[in-house]
Amino acid sequence: PFQVYRHLVGSKQIEDTLIYEEKDPTFHVSVGNSRSMQFIEIDISSTTSSETLLLKSSNPLESPAIFFPRVLNHLYSVEHDPEHNRFLIHTNWKAKNFRLMETALQKSKKRSQWQEIVPHKDSVLLQSVLSYPKNIVLMERESGLRRLRVLDAKGNFERVVSFNDPSYTAYLAANPEYTSTKFYYGYSSMRSPDSIYSVDLQSGRKRKLK
């Protein structure tokens, strides 16, 4: 995909408005809602660079705004955290294994105004991030194995989700609700078939769902 159109419900498709077109064939374009449901995200990415454009869900007729313009060899993605009036940024800027930063939307175009929450680690790959009103959930990889780490909203450590097997596969499942008190992950090993679990963000209690 390389184009994004705006469609007015009830109108003819031929009347749709082109709001973004990617000229570089090495980039892929996708569209989705932020987990807060307050923004529509247009994500543009290649193997070495990425860029996010935002539209307020309350005003989808406006033009999309660039969060931070693409730069060669800079990959990033964002998580809206309305509870703290910020965006979390999963970025490889000066961090080959990625780190977590934050900024207010009005400061997003200047990386010098981004603030670090989780620093880069040479031995740990930060793969993905989920934001919640009181917590941040990280999917990391160390020594070939993934782990799930729960932080408070300031980035202070709270807990690691424990796995019983020495070798396993774990992944974040669908977690569409920013305001949820739980998050969901998938897990499998030689002894355990692929299953989905929930984790209570306050107590850390795990529950097998299927």
Regions found by a protein language model. Name each.
Residues 1-210:
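Peripheral, non-catalytic segments that deliver or gate enzyme domains
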